[in-house]
A protein has these predicted regions:
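Short, surface-exposed secondary-structure edge patches
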Residues: 107, 214, 246-247
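HotDog/MaoC-like acyl-thioester-processing domains
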Residues: 1-36, 80-82, 97-183, 251, ...
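A conserved acidic, glycine/proline-rich C-terminal tail/linker
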Residues: 227-257
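Hydrophobic residues on conserved beta-strands that form the core of alpha/beta folds
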Residues: 41, 136, 150, 238-240
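Short, glycine- and charge-enriched coil/turn segments that flank and shape catalytic ligand pockets
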Residues: 63-64, 143-146, 236
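Hot-dog-fold acyl-thioester-processing enzymes
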Residues: 1-99, 164-234
Length: 285
């Protein structure tokens, strides 16, 4: 259970723009990380993506032109997560943090361009047995008195000692292949243009190597959105998705989608490795 309730205010500050947040994140210094540091909750007001912004997102990722994909809710939630982690009391540097899990659940249809309020709270987990530190950010979005979606992300903030058990070879899941896509070398920049996430590790080789990667990798939520677009063509509109990011996907790679029709689970495979494990809930009727 989260220990910090969302702040309730009659009015809330506007949600900062993504480029400004990313610039501040480059210089964010960590505070002292105790066993259970208390990080203030945040509340921001923002507007849902308008029809034009959604059209660009949908065209890139394969959704219907007028769709409001559940994955698009992450675009606002990510900004709320970043703004919350920029608190001086957040104990970790943002550079080097790794997005390891995400879940999004839609409670009601989001109206394009409608005013939303985002409330975000933080849980910093105790160190694992290997010394790793994780944090969880939970954002809930409301349209007046109506809750419209919740988005929860888990991040690896500090890597621990190498765990031999977790380093064992991955078993490939016994699911049929039902689709896939070829990533272009410009897809990281294309997704940045529609999402606002200009993290350098997704853009070009020199920038990625500057941050310790051999090659640029695609945004994890780009992979999730591409998978959802293919799954929706088979099972109807998705209203919830939960994923675990297992390995990075380099730009220029081929991604395979494994999924058995009529089941919730899916897997993305790249280069013989499991990249994403997930489950999806489709709208009833």
């Amino acid at each position: 259970m989260f220990q910090i309730p969302p702040v309730q205010t009659p009015t809330a500050p506007p949600l900062p723009a993504a480029p400004a947040l990313l610039l501040r994140a480059l210089f964010k210094r960590g505070a002292q990380a105790g066993a259970a540091p208390q990080v203030p909750a945040t509340v921001f007001d923002c507007t849902a993506p308008n029809a034009a912004a959604l059209g660009r997102y949908n065209a890139l990722l394969g959704f219907a032109p007028d769709a409001m994909p559940v994955s698009a809710h992450y675009l606002l939630a990510q900004r709320a997560h970043l703004a919350t982690m920029l608190s001086p009391r957040f104990p970790f540097r943002l550079l080097g943090m790794v997005h390891v899990e995400n879940s999004i659940a839609e409670h009601a249809m989001v109206v394009p361009g409608r005013l939303l309020r985002l409330a975000t709270r933080v849980q910093v987990e105790a160190p694992t047995r290997t010394g790793a530190r994780f944090c969880v950010l939970e954002t809930t979005a409301s349209d007046g008195a109506r809750s419209v979606f919740a988005c929860t992300s888990r991040y690896l903030a500090l890597a621990g000692r190498r765990d031999a058990a977790r380093s064992a070879p991955q078993a490939m899941p016994a699911l049929p292949e039902c689709g896939g896509w070829q990533l272009g070398h410009g897809d990281g920049r294309a997704y940045a243009r529609v999402s606002g996430d200009w993290n350098p590790i997704h853009l070009a080789g020199p920038a990625a190597r500057l941050f310790g990667l051999r090659a640029p990798i695609i945004h994890g939520m780009h992979s999730v959105a591409k998978a959802l677009a293919l799954l929706e063509a088979q099972g109807g509109r998705a209203t919830a998705v939960a994923v675990r990011f297992r390995s990075p996907v380099p730009l220029g790679s081929r991604v395979r989608l494994l999924h058995a029709p009529g089941t919730p689970d899916f897997v993305l495979v790249c280069g013989g490795k499991v990249a994403v494990e997930g489950s999806v809930v489709f709208a009833q009727g």
